Amino acid sequence: MLLIPSFTANSNEPPPSKLSLSDLSMAILKSHFFLLFPLLLLHFHTVSFAQTLFVFGDGLYDAGNKQFLSQNRVDASFPPYGVTVGQATGRWSDGSIVPDYLAKFMGIPKISPILLTTADFSHGANFAIADATVLGSPPETMTLSQQVKKFSENKNKWTNQTRSEAIYLIYIGSDDYLSYAKSNPSPSDTQKQAFVDQVITTIKAEIKVVYGSGGRKFAFQNLAPLGCLPAVKQASGNVQECVKLPSEMAALHNKKLLQLLVELSRELNGFQYSFYDFFSSIQNRVIKSKTYTFETGNAACCGTGSINGSNCSAKNVCAKPEEYIFFDGKHLTQEANLQVGHLMWGADPEVIGPNNIRELMVLPLDITVILAGIQEAMAAMRPRQSNIESLYDIKKMESEMDNHWLYQVDKAISFMI
């Protein structure tokens, strides 16, 4: 069963809303309804609800892979991790993580870690693992390339159609930039850009590998303001302010990542995506914690030091994790993960675009073919197309797309199904 969650009270992000067409878009759609409707009906047979979720990333999405790969003690396999749900499961939180909630909203079971060989993978697999990076070869983890390779090795567990209809959820890069900032405290603008380009180029290559295996629907959660993580602030010695360089690197990454997704949507036939502004969501909650139901956005629930930025253990955990954004120095509480899950699932374009995941999962696989035909037939009548060149100006991007009538047809299709 498909679940439609409600939003957490007091959130400034808009809740899911029904389709709102601009006057111009509505006029065009009405006047050309008889031209468009047969085309839409002709292709409705390709529409189906995604029932499979593949997850790639780092500790924010790790459902337990670290405990199967590491030769050392994995903290997430022991209390106080899992304290809110009664047991530690290898998740770096007091309870559920974002992929768990998205699976729930999709109406499927939680997605198991791929290294749990006895698991049921009929609805997908989770390849994410703590400490994962895009670049390099860190020990006891899997880089993005290694995660994608593991997916390729196991892809025959799923049919071609299943892989093409699935959602591919990705969050990775934090550890790359945290390591870079630690090793390069004063890089030039050119050096910063060069490193970001390396990361983005690798992500592009791995997206294309997944695309080559049938992947079409990609959901990206952009990077958090890394300098605001309790672990990073505490290590800097100034716990009252976010550290500039890690957050700056994350913002540069997010800009380039959005540009990449726009580029791929033009280059790869059938490529569809969601881009969630996680950076702003966390930044807003750190600055205005109480607005989002949290008591503090500065300190972690579990750990040692002035803001609990390190060494989370059962001896130093808070009584009410739900009052905190961060459970440990780098990872979110279940409550924060729930809010993020809601936003990714059903928020408006100011938060996630051009589709939220609820819309992405029902988009026809050949929607680009439909829209391309309509676009060609009515090119002279449409408003200007959006020209997304500024990477991290999501509100500008979505404002322009909201005036693009083809974008409205896209939305109309998903809501008519």
UniProtKB/Swiss-Prot annotation:
CDD domains named among the record's database cross-references: SGNH_plant_lipase_like
Induction cue: Up-regulated by methyl jasmonate and upon pathogen infection.
N-terminal signal peptide: 1-50
Tissue expression from the record: Expressed throughout the seedling, rosette leaves, roots, inflorescence and imbibed seed, but not in pollen.
Active site: 331
Effect of inactivating the gene: Defects in endoplasmic reticulum (ER) protein export and organizational defects in the ER, including aggregation of ER around the nucleus. Increased sensitivity to salt.
Any single GO BP term: intracellular protein transport
UniProt keyword terms in alphabetical order: Endoplasmic reticulum, Glycoprotein, Signal, Vacuole
Keyword Glycoprotein in record: yes
Domain of life where this protein originates: Eukaryota
UniProt xrefs under InterPro entries: GDSL, GLIP1-5/GLL25, SGNH_hydro_sf, SGNH_plant_lipase-like
Residues listed as glycosylation sites in the UniProt record: 160, 308, 311
Keyword Signal: yes
One Pfam family this sequence matches: Lipase_GDSL
GO cellular component: endoplasmic reticulum; ER body; plant-type vacuole; plant-type vacuole membrane; plasmodesma; vacuole
Subcellular location: Vacuole; Endoplasmic reticulum
Alphabetized GO MF terms: hydrolase activity, acting on ester bonds
Effect of residue 80 to L: Defects in endoplasmic reticulum (ER) protein export and organizational defects in the ER
Principal cellular location given in the protein's record: other
Sequence similarity: Belongs to the 'GDSL' lipolytic enzyme family.
Subunit annotation: Interacts with the PYK10 complex and TGG2, but not with TGG1 or PEN2.
Function according to Swiss-Prot or TrEMBL: Involved in organization of the endomembrane system and is required for endoplasmic reticulum morphology and organelle distribution. May act by inhibiting the formation of PYK10 complex by binding to GLL23 and exporting it from the ER. Required for proper subcellular localization of myrosinase TGG2. Has no lipase or esterase activity.
Entry protein name: Inactive GDSL esterase/lipase-like protein 25
Native species: Arabidopsis thaliana (Mouse-ear cress)
